[in-house]
Amino acid sequence: MNDTQEQRRVAVITGASSGIGAATARALAADGYRVALLARRVDRITALADELGNAAIAIEADVTDRDALLAAADRVQQERGGADVLINNAGVMLLGPFSSDQREDYRRMIEVNLLGAITTTEVFLDQLKSGGGDVVNISSVAGRTARSGNGVYAATKWGLNGWSESLRQELLPDVRVTVIEPGAVATELPGHITHEETKQYAAQAYSQVTVTAEDIAEVIAFAVNRPRHLAIHEVLLRPAGQATP
């Protein structure tokens, strides 16, 4: 590794195998970042790392597994000198009416969307503090408003927003905390819904109006590239034609 490579910022991205995570990896790599791609689907992040070249490393990790995250953090420290930016992007959106039939979905959303971001940040925090870092938490428009059928998903995003504000106050000015709240984005998330009627409704809604993952990634890159005296704390993004929350 040459001196120029050593000076480039390092961004760790969870959920990097697709959607906003993969798009953000491409955007930050284009801006000169060395990216560490974390996800469960190792084949996808390996292919993405190959696409991006030697600026990227692929690390198999599940954000619900603290031991896996500790191993990932150790590898980032050893191979890249530590993280400067953490993008907490891993998430699931398992919408549906509230019932005991959905109880596993509820647990999964809480473990991934909320506890996953908290644990990943806890594990990487010392690295981020060492040189002036950024934490970017990918929330949702559902973190501002709830609607029928998205109650637990919204709860995880409201929780993420509340924790992010507390974290921002604790870590300033050395580590900036940014919350990104996308509306409808063309990603895999709606396809993972297990409640069939809700899945069909979401597919129809998403077929009418979305933005791309690249649109969101561009905003993330803008936020982390601001001068250190400026912090962008919260960004709400919707397709221009999205009327519903």
Regions found by a protein language model. Name each.
Residues 121, 156:
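Active-site helix of classical SDR
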